[in-house]
Amino acid sequence: NPQGKRVVLFGAGGAARAVAVELALAGAESFHIVNRSVERGQALVELLRHKTLAKAELVAWLGPYRIPADVDIVVNATSIGLFPDVDATLDLDLDTLRPELVVADGIHNPPLTHLLRTAQSRGCRTVDGLGMLVNQGVIGVEYWTGRTPNAQVMRESLLALKL
């Protein structure tokens, strides 16, 4: 439940915008938008400030990012770590991943990214990118067929592929 939570969001593209707006509408209190492009990052900050009640600030990503002590949720909405470049890692100070954090990665292939493996090893609760992929698929199938597919079956089928 994102109600009242403070979020660090890596990225400012389409996936980041969707995640940020949904978290804000669900009650997230504030966002640190961490992005290399100041212009794109600031556009997301302005969107959040003008369309939601959440506070938002842009943080320039100039080196290993340290997760602030007051943050509750960390989300990677970049393509860093996406197949085939699965060994790529966020420029993140991994020592700042604390057990009480929820760490989510929008990447669906591989489902268990370097970020998520590291977060799990540090006791964090993790959320993989398959959920976003599956829910996009559910919406697409509903749109085209008028029928609602079983999201759990879709997720299990994707996992069975062992991508």
What annotation goes with each model-predicted range?
Residues 9-10, 33, 105:
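Hydrophobic Val/Ile/Leu positions in short beta-strands of Rossmann-like dinucleotide-binding domains
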Residues 26-52:
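NAD(P)-binding Rossmann-fold cofactor-contacting core
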Residues 1-3, 26, 97-98:
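Short, flexible coil/linker segments at domain boundaries that flank nucleotide/cofactor-interacting
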Residues 4, 100-102, 106-163:
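Adenosine-phosphate binding glycine-rich loop
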Residues 25-30, 121-125:
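Conserved S-adenosyl-L-methionine
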Residues 54-126:
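Rossmann-like adenosine-cofactor binding region
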Residues 4-24:
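Glycine-rich adenosine-cofactor-binding loop
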